[in-house]
């Protein structure tokens, strides 16, 4: 199993988002950190995120890579 597969199977997007400071509401929505967002427009679930405002989308590795300006490999290492 690769590092990417391991991270994606063991760490949920919701958990990572909350761990890194995003405030996710009861319906899995939060304010998108990738654009100025006054109201929650990013939907998160266990496996992916999607912003209805700016179109940002991806899995847990993509989320952490974008949050911290990392490569996918660096984000996977940070999550491992």
Label every model-predicted segment.
Residues 1-80:
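N-terminal structured subdomain of primase-like DNA metabolism proteins
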